[in-house]
Curated annotation (Swiss-Prot):
Keywords for the protein's UniProt record, in alphabetical order: DNA damage, DNA repair, DNA replication, Ligase, Magnesium, Manganese, Metal-binding, NAD, Zinc
All residue ranges annotated as the BRCT domain in the record: 587-667
Pfam families in the record: BRCT (PF00533), DNA_ligase_aden (PF01653), DNA_ligase_OB (PF03120), HHH_2 (PF12826), HHH_5 (PF14520)
Protein name: DNA ligase
Coiled coil regions, renumbered to chain: none
Ligand binding (Zn(2+)): C407, C410, C423, C429
GO molecular function: DNA binding; DNA ligase (NAD+) activity; metal ion binding
GO terms, biological process: DNA repair; DNA replication
Listed PANTHER family: CHROMOSOME TRANSMISSION FIDELITY FACTOR 18, DNA LIGASE
Role summary: DNA ligase that catalyzes the formation of phosphodiester linkages between 5'-phosphoryl and 3'-hydroxyl groups in double-stranded DNA using NAD as a coenzyme and as the energy source for the reaction. It is essential for DNA replication and repair of damaged DNA.
EC number: 6.5.1.2
Positions annotated as active site in the UniProt record: K121 (n6-amp-lysine intermediate)
One GO CC term on file: cytosol
Amino acid sequence: MVDKIERIKELVEILNKYSYDYYVLDNPSVSDKDYDKKYDELKLLEKETGVVLPYSPTLRIGDIVLDGFNKYTHKGKLWSLDKAQSLDEIKDWHNRNIKFVNDMRAQGEDLPDLKYIATKKFDGLTVNLTYNEEGMLEVSATRGNGEIGENVTAQVKTIKSIPLKLQENHDLFEVHGEAIMTQEAFEKYNSSADSPLKNLRNGAAGALRNLNVKETARRDLSAFFYDVGYKEGYQFKTYLEMMDFIKEKGLPVDDYLKVCVSIEDIKNEIDYIEKIRFDLNYDIDGLVIAIDDIRTRELLGYTVKFPKWAIAYKFEAQEATTKLVDVEWNVGRSGRIGPTAILEPVELAGVTVKRATLNNMDDIKRKGVRIGADVFIRRSNDVIPEIMGTLENTLENSEEIFPPTECPACGSHVVLNGAHYFCENTLSCKPQLVKTIVHYASRDAMNIAGFSEKTAEQLFEKLNIKSISDLYKLKKEDLINLEKFGDKKAENLLNAVEGSKECKLYSFIYALGIPNVGVKTAKDIVNKFKSIDGLKNATFEELVSVQDVGDIVAQDIIEFFKEEKVISTIDELLSLGVNPIFDEVKIVESIFKDKTVVATGTLQNYSRTEIKTKLESLGAKVSGSVSKKTDYVIAGESAGSKLTKAEELGVEVISEEEFEKMLGRES
């Protein structure tokens, strides 16, 4: 029995370390298989012995339903923040701070020059965690009225990035943070939820106030911590010192934390965060600006509601409510008929929104969307916002939305395949054929210069072009009769079509429009199979062995090449002179092999395409965004937010000259 308890302690310590590496450091130190093996061993030992340590990772699964919430009195008050919605309001606050510091100095106080710390204002639910002298998570509570909150310890324990026991601790302390739901967790939850969540904030708040803790665990929340509200023993001298303390304790802290010493600095940070806010995987609604020096904070004090030493700059809302006027059904390249919401115009994040995404009929039903009702809309980084839900008190006199019974473009029969409706008329449905031809001619595909959707529509309507192979049968005398086509434009288009015959194999594969096969996947499968015939005859097992090709993509490829129409089109293209060439990339041994590299800014000796090709020839994985998993950022002139993010994350940044020197050392 004693040996089993010792093993339980050992496994708990090991598994908590693995969780810290994965969820806080974003640096997994063990495979999922090895983690699961140890986790299963721990569960078995706990069942056999009846011993479950209060910081065991098995407590995170939430196998309990509570009767209600108990009240908890915070040791340190959780204050609200005063809000500013313009830079002028920030300036007024800053000027008051300058005057105060000068007045205090005149009275003999030795205060440092003003220094502010800027952090993101997370849009979730505030939580207050209490760790005791032994480092155990004793209580977790909501903010409540700032003095008394609700005990949500069981719910907070489901957040995997929050340590249940600190590695080392001597003083009892309370730490404030924000429980949030990431976009990824939100989408995963909504994909199978009976009642989909309307937004990320409600997802987090609802999870922590759910008495069924298993439901909380399903939401897969995250958290960031940013303030120590109460601490026994040593007291901090600066906010930066406080943040270092939080980080050292193993609590998750956001990477963004900027020192500002002037209004110009603050403005730059506001501009930067507004620029990247829609690229984030979670919601923020502003920027918090706080004085760094704790003594200055103490002297400034508080109003009835707010600390005088901090202010929150609020961004324009990402969400709004408006009326759904109608639903429009549109046909895509694959024949899929998708719904688009037509809205009463509404201002959202500085943009007038008139349309929004509705994914399919299942999405419409789950969200309870009806014509004439008011809907929540959310704008992220997409051009078109998405409908998140419906205001239930506006459903009276609203109309049900019905799926299409025929193709809205050609009137043909429609079929339901999975969650989506499709037009079966692949031979003459205008939107399908026009979009197929436009995709085939696009830059990343066959790169037929000067080819537009307007041109494709004219070719379909006036010249009866119904297949991508028909492009290679065009004649000048046909083209010059089209609107805005003269001799020169006709010749240029014919030359571009002719020039496209000599193409790279991956471009040709991408141009064919295989479902779920983008440029990168096309390159990956071409490097594996090296020819059209090789790909046509590939087995499911061979396809899923290619990096980033999963079961769905593999099945899509197999089904695509089963179509007689596809095979006959490919054969006709080849007979018309299209000659896809496979250029085998020879990977040279390099320091960049298997490294993730991002290039940003203007490079002197490489275009975007050239640096990408060069890096791929060195065996690098080229990414378009910077994360903790990025190994190098090559920064050229006028490098912007990617460079800033790399510096924040501690990613190695090299210049173009340094990049070439690194290559030179290897040759």
